[in-house]
Amino acid sequence: MNPIMIQAVNDDGQSIGEIEKIAAHENEGTWHRAISVFLFDAEGRLLIQQRSEAKYHFAGLWANSCCSHPTVDETIEHAAHRAMLHELGVYSNVKELAVVRYEATDPVTGHTEREHDHILIGVLTEEPNFNPSEVQAIRWVSLNGLRIEIEQQPEKFAPWLPIILKQVSFSS
């Protein structure tokens, strides 16, 4: 399998080159570009996924609808569409809502996220057909219910989810 090359970034989020995806998460991590997609249904509920146990970091934790890293020649929107199709088997128009920078280390694997994370939102009108190599479960939740759940059981959630929910307003 060919290595996946993603976009390394500086403190301002400007591309400064490329780095292999796994290498970007090793040791203390390297700042890199990422996307986090938040898909809502017509009732305003958010689709969240439980990450597969096969993931190389933060396996088995609940996260937003899907995440990925734009490859070196890929736009943010294309990366979002690729991730939605690969992880959830769906397509939705998305728009960028915000950018969040965060760092988080997986206590199990030692892999570190240092992400300049583009937050995208969309409305999903079809039923997801998730890829079990990426996702082990999905569910629809209200944002308020999700915030309460994260407060009560933070260990069940990927660390970027509460960070994004605190920094980004999802109200229409």
Positions of predicted regions on the chain:
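The catalytic Nudix box helix
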Residues: 47-48, 63-97
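Nudix hydrolase/Nudix homology domain
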Residues: 23, 60, 72, 101-107, ...
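A structural signal for short, well-ordered beta-strand segments
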Residues: 37, 66, 96, 118-120
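A glycine-rich, hydrophobic loop/mini-helix early in the fold
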Residues: 34-66
